[in-house]
Amino acid sequence: MKLQRGDVVFLRFPFSDGTGSKVRPAVVVQSDRDNQRLESTIVVSITGNTRLVGKEPGHILVDVNTPEGKAAGLRFTSAVNTHGLFTLHTKLIEEHVGQLSPRLMAAVDAELRASLGL
């Protein structure tokens, strides 16, 4: 599967304690250059829990009732969680469902810079 930065995908996400995994949505944040040459990619998680949006840094709302939310391909309004940053083998990606808009990706980038101190 050819990945691009900003792709919304469903993948087998490992539990933080390493005991298993569950299919979850995520956003590809790795550069297109590296997505072309590597068998792994860097993603941030997406959660259905939106209660921290606007209250805590690192959470960006994806409202499925908006055109850009629909383009993301999610089933319900969700939050991108930039604290859920993972490097995963691309074999774990099960489905490509959409793309984040440039505006949402700019918000993700800003939160990643803040989280990583860049």
Predicted stretch roles:
Residues 1-118:
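Conserved functional hotspots at enzyme active or ligand-binding sites that engage polyanionic ligands
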